Protein backbone atom coordinates (compact mmCIF):
# COMPACT_ATOMS: atom_id res chain seq x y z
CA UNK A 1 0.00 0.00 0.00
CA UNK A 2 2.88 2.38 0.76
CA UNK A 3 4.46 1.71 -2.64
CA UNK A 4 1.20 2.45 -4.43
CA UNK A 5 0.94 5.78 -2.54
CA UNK A 6 4.49 6.75 -3.55
CA UNK A 7 3.78 5.87 -7.20
CA UNK A 8 0.69 8.06 -7.16
CA UNK A 9 2.72 10.95 -5.67
CA UNK A 10 5.43 10.61 -8.35
CA UNK A 11 2.78 10.58 -11.09
CA UNK A 12 1.21 13.74 -9.66
CA UNK A 13 4.62 15.47 -9.57
CA UNK A 14 5.33 14.56 -13.21
CA UNK A 15 1.89 15.80 -14.26
CA UNK A 16 2.42 19.23 -12.62
CA UNK A 17 5.78 19.95 -14.25
CA UNK A 18 8.41 17.87 -12.52
CA UNK A 19 8.77 19.54 -9.11
CA UNK A 20 6.73 18.62 -6.09
CA UNK A 21 4.61 21.39 -4.64
CA UNK A 22 6.11 21.80 -1.20
CA UNK A 23 4.52 25.11 -0.44
CA UNK A 24 1.72 25.21 2.09
CA UNK A 25 -1.73 24.51 0.77
CA UNK A 26 -4.72 26.81 0.89
CA UNK A 27 -4.03 30.09 2.59
CA UNK A 28 -0.24 30.11 2.42
CA UNK A 29 -0.02 29.25 -1.26
CA UNK A 30 -2.97 31.35 -2.33
CA UNK A 31 -1.79 34.62 -0.77
CA UNK A 32 1.95 34.48 -1.31
CA UNK A 33 4.66 33.60 -3.78
CA UNK A 34 4.29 33.57 -7.50
CA UNK A 35 0.49 33.38 -7.40
CA UNK A 36 0.23 36.84 -5.89
CA UNK A 37 2.59 38.29 -8.45
CA UNK A 38 0.59 36.68 -11.21
CA UNK A 39 -2.62 38.21 -9.90
CA UNK A 40 -0.97 41.61 -9.77
CA UNK A 41 0.21 41.21 -13.32
CA UNK A 42 -3.28 40.20 -14.39
CA UNK A 43 -4.79 43.33 -12.88
CA UNK A 44 -2.21 45.42 -14.71
CA UNK A 45 -3.17 43.91 -18.05
CA UNK A 46 -6.86 44.56 -17.37
CA UNK A 47 -6.10 48.21 -16.58
CA UNK A 48 -4.12 48.54 -19.80
CA UNK A 49 -7.02 47.15 -21.83
CA UNK A 50 -9.42 49.52 -20.12
CA UNK A 51 -7.21 52.50 -20.93
CA UNK A 52 -6.99 51.59 -24.61
CA UNK A 53 -10.76 51.24 -24.76
CA UNK A 54 -11.26 54.80 -23.49
CA UNK A 55 -8.85 56.12 -26.09
CA UNK A 56 -10.73 54.31 -28.83
CA UNK A 57 -14.04 55.80 -27.69
CA UNK A 58 -12.59 59.31 -27.75
CA UNK A 59 -11.07 58.59 -31.17
CA UNK A 60 -8.09 60.82 -30.39
CA UNK A 61 -10.27 63.94 -30.64
CA UNK A 62 -9.96 66.86 -28.27
CA UNK A 63 -13.01 67.15 -26.06
CA UNK A 64 -14.56 70.31 -24.67
CA UNK A 65 -14.68 70.19 -20.88
CA UNK A 66 -16.88 72.54 -18.86
CA UNK A 67 -16.81 72.72 -15.06
CA UNK A 68 -20.44 73.47 -14.19
CA UNK A 69 -20.50 73.36 -10.41
CA UNK A 70 -18.31 72.50 -7.46
CA UNK A 71 -19.36 72.39 -3.83
CA UNK A 72 -18.03 71.26 -0.49
CA UNK A 73 -19.44 68.11 1.05
CA UNK A 74 -18.95 66.35 4.37
CA UNK A 75 -19.24 62.82 5.63
CA UNK A 76 -19.85 62.02 9.28
CA UNK A 77 -17.67 59.17 10.56
CA UNK A 78 -16.86 57.78 13.95
CA UNK A 79 -14.06 60.26 14.57
CA UNK A 80 -15.97 63.32 13.40
CA UNK A 81 -16.58 64.83 9.97
CA UNK A 82 -14.62 64.27 6.80
CA UNK A 83 -14.73 67.15 4.33
CA UNK A 84 -14.38 66.82 0.60
CA UNK A 85 -15.49 68.33 -2.69
CA UNK A 86 -18.04 67.35 -5.34
CA UNK A 87 -17.65 68.45 -8.97
CA UNK A 88 -20.11 68.47 -11.88
CA UNK A 89 -18.52 68.43 -15.34
CA UNK A 90 -19.95 68.46 -18.88
CA UNK A 91 -17.88 67.04 -21.74
CA UNK A 92 -18.54 67.19 -25.49
CA UNK A 93 -16.81 66.96 -28.85
CA UNK A 94 -18.58 69.95 -30.40
CA UNK A 95 -20.03 67.70 -33.10
CA UNK A 96 -23.21 66.34 -31.55
CA UNK A 97 -21.87 64.25 -28.66
CA UNK A 98 -21.97 65.27 -25.01
CA UNK A 99 -22.20 63.82 -21.53
CA UNK A 100 -22.09 64.84 -17.90
CA UNK A 101 -20.62 63.30 -14.78
CA UNK A 102 -20.00 64.00 -11.12
CA UNK A 103 -17.12 63.08 -8.86
CA UNK A 104 -16.24 63.36 -5.19
CA UNK A 105 -12.80 63.48 -3.60
CA UNK A 106 -10.84 65.04 -0.75
CA UNK A 107 -9.20 67.53 -3.14
CA UNK A 108 -10.69 69.67 -5.91
CA UNK A 109 -8.43 68.49 -8.79
CA UNK A 110 -9.13 64.84 -8.02
CA UNK A 111 -12.89 65.48 -7.89
CA UNK A 112 -12.76 67.21 -11.29
CA UNK A 113 -10.75 64.33 -12.75
CA UNK A 114 -13.29 61.78 -11.53
CA UNK A 115 -16.20 63.83 -12.86
CA UNK A 116 -14.53 64.25 -16.25
CA UNK A 117 -13.90 60.52 -16.56
CA UNK A 118 -17.53 59.78 -15.66
CA UNK A 119 -18.76 62.30 -18.24
CA UNK A 120 -16.66 60.73 -21.00
CA UNK A 121 -18.16 57.32 -20.25
CA UNK A 122 -21.71 58.71 -20.37
CA UNK A 123 -21.53 60.60 -23.67
CA UNK A 124 -24.60 60.42 -25.92
CA UNK A 125 -25.18 61.51 -29.50
CA UNK A 126 -27.79 64.14 -30.35
CA UNK A 127 -28.85 64.73 -33.98
CA UNK A 128 -28.34 68.35 -35.03
CA UNK A 129 -29.95 70.31 -37.85
CA UNK A 130 -27.32 71.73 -40.19
CA UNK A 131 -24.81 71.06 -37.41
CA UNK A 132 -25.83 74.20 -35.52
CA UNK A 133 -29.30 73.82 -33.92
CA UNK A 134 -31.94 71.29 -32.88
CA UNK A 135 -34.34 69.59 -35.26
CA UNK A 136 -37.45 70.42 -33.24
CA UNK A 137 -38.67 71.81 -29.93
CA UNK A 138 -38.56 69.66 -26.83
CA UNK A 139 -39.20 69.49 -23.11
CA UNK A 140 -37.25 67.82 -20.35
CA UNK A 141 -37.85 67.24 -16.69
CA UNK A 142 -35.98 65.85 -13.73
CA UNK A 143 -37.20 66.26 -10.18
CA UNK A 144 -38.43 69.82 -9.71
CA UNK A 145 -36.52 71.07 -12.75
CA UNK A 146 -38.21 71.67 -16.11
CA UNK A 147 -36.59 72.95 -19.29
CA UNK A 148 -37.90 73.94 -22.72
CA UNK A 149 -35.59 73.90 -25.74
CA UNK A 150 -36.41 75.34 -29.17
CA UNK A 151 -34.60 75.34 -32.48
CA UNK A 152 -33.59 78.77 -33.77
CA UNK A 153 -32.54 80.37 -37.08
CA UNK A 154 -28.92 81.09 -37.87
CA UNK A 155 -27.44 84.02 -35.96
CA UNK A 156 -29.64 83.63 -32.90
CA UNK A 157 -26.87 82.37 -30.65
CA UNK A 158 -27.17 80.34 -27.47
CA UNK A 159 -29.93 81.86 -25.38
CA UNK A 160 -29.41 79.82 -22.23
CA UNK A 161 -27.99 80.45 -18.84
CA UNK A 162 -26.02 78.63 -16.22
CA UNK A 163 -25.57 74.89 -16.61
CA UNK A 164 -27.65 74.71 -19.80
CA UNK A 165 -25.23 76.92 -21.71
CA UNK A 166 -22.34 74.61 -20.87
CA UNK A 167 -24.27 71.66 -22.32
CA UNK A 168 -25.00 73.36 -25.65
CA UNK A 169 -21.48 74.74 -25.99
CA UNK A 170 -20.01 71.29 -25.44
CA UNK A 171 -22.55 69.75 -27.82
CA UNK A 172 -21.65 72.12 -30.65
CA UNK A 173 -25.01 73.94 -30.84
CA UNK A 174 -24.67 77.57 -31.89
CA UNK A 175 -28.34 78.60 -32.21
CA UNK A 176 -30.92 77.61 -29.61
CA UNK A 177 -33.52 79.20 -27.34
CA UNK A 178 -34.12 77.69 -23.90
CA UNK A 179 -36.04 78.38 -20.73
CA UNK A 180 -35.82 76.71 -17.34
CA UNK A 181 -38.64 76.56 -14.81
CA UNK A 182 -38.52 75.39 -11.23
CA UNK A 183 -35.38 74.53 -9.34
CA UNK A 184 -32.03 76.14 -10.00
CA UNK A 185 -30.15 73.08 -8.76
CA UNK A 186 -27.43 72.54 -11.39
CA UNK A 187 -27.64 68.74 -11.13
CA UNK A 188 -31.37 68.72 -11.83
CA UNK A 189 -31.04 71.28 -14.62
CA UNK A 190 -28.33 69.26 -16.37
CA UNK A 191 -30.35 66.05 -16.13
CA UNK A 192 -33.50 67.81 -17.38
CA UNK A 193 -31.56 69.25 -20.32
CA UNK A 194 -30.24 65.85 -21.33
CA UNK A 195 -33.73 64.43 -20.92
CA UNK A 196 -34.93 66.91 -23.55
CA UNK A 197 -31.95 66.28 -25.84
CA UNK A 198 -32.31 62.50 -25.83
CA UNK A 199 -35.83 62.91 -27.27
CA UNK A 200 -34.48 64.69 -30.35
CA UNK A 201 -35.03 62.81 -33.62
CA UNK A 202 -34.01 63.76 -37.14
CA UNK A 203 -36.31 63.54 -40.19
CA UNK A 204 -34.00 60.89 -41.60
CA UNK A 205 -34.50 58.57 -38.63
CA UNK A 206 -38.28 59.16 -38.71
CA UNK A 207 -38.38 58.37 -42.42
CA UNK A 208 -36.43 55.16 -41.91
CA UNK A 209 -38.73 54.10 -39.08
CA UNK A 210 -41.85 54.74 -41.17
CA UNK A 211 -40.44 53.37 -44.40
CA UNK A 212 -40.75 56.66 -46.29
CA UNK A 213 -38.50 59.19 -47.95
CA UNK A 214 -37.34 62.35 -46.18
CA UNK A 215 -38.70 64.48 -49.02
CA UNK A 216 -42.16 62.99 -48.50
CA UNK A 217 -42.18 64.05 -44.84
CA UNK A 218 -40.89 67.57 -45.52
CA UNK A 219 -43.30 68.12 -48.40
CA UNK A 220 -46.32 67.88 -46.12
CA UNK A 221 -45.77 71.35 -44.70
CA UNK A 222 -46.89 73.03 -47.95
CA UNK A 223 -43.44 73.07 -49.55
CA UNK A 224 -43.04 72.13 -53.17
CA UNK A 225 -41.42 68.89 -54.24
CA UNK A 226 -38.24 70.69 -55.30
CA UNK A 227 -37.98 72.56 -51.99
CA UNK A 228 -38.62 69.37 -50.03
CA UNK A 229 -35.92 67.48 -51.91
CA UNK A 230 -33.44 70.34 -51.42
CA UNK A 231 -34.21 70.44 -47.70
CA UNK A 232 -33.86 66.66 -47.47
CA UNK A 233 -30.40 66.80 -49.03
CA UNK A 234 -29.35 69.54 -46.60
CA UNK A 235 -30.32 67.53 -43.54
CA UNK A 236 -27.35 66.09 -41.68
CA UNK A 237 -27.43 63.72 -38.76
From Swiss-Prot:
PROSITE patterns membership: RIBOSOMAL_S5, S5_DSRBD
InterPro entries named among the record's database cross-references: Ribosomal_Su5_D2-typ_SF, Ribosomal_uS5, Ribosomal_uS5_bac-type, Ribosomal_uS5_C, Ribosomal_uS5_N, Ribosomal_uS5_N_CS, Ribsml_uS5_D2-typ_fold_subgr
The name this protein goes by in its record: Small ribosomal subunit protein uS5
Family: Belongs to the universal ribosomal protein uS5 family.
Short name of any one Pfam family annotated for the protein: Ribosomal_S5
Region annotation Disordered: where it falls in the sequence: 1-59
GO cellular component, one term: small ribosomal subunit
Entry function: With S4 and S12 plays an important role in translational accuracy. Located at the back of the 30S subunit body where it stabilizes the conformation of the head with respect to the body.
Record field: compositional bias (Basic and acidic residues): 20-55
GO molecular function: rRNA binding; structural constituent of ribosome
Subunit-structure text: Part of the 30S ribosomal subunit. Contacts proteins S4 and S8.
Residues annotated as domain S5 DRBM: 63-126
Domain notes: The N-terminal domain interacts with the head of the 30S subunit; the C-terminal domain interacts with the body and contacts protein S4. The interaction surface between S4 and S5 is involved in control of translational fidelity.
Keywords: Ribonucleoprotein, Ribosomal protein, RNA-binding, rRNA-binding
A biological process term (GO) from this entry: translation
Amino acid sequence: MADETNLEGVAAVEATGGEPQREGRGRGRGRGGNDRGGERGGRGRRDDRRGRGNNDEEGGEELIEKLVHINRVSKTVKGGKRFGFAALVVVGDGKGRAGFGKGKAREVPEAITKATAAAKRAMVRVPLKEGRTLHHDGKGRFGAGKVNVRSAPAGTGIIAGGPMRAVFESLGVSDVVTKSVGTSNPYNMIRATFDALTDQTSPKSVAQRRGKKVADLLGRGGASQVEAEAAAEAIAE
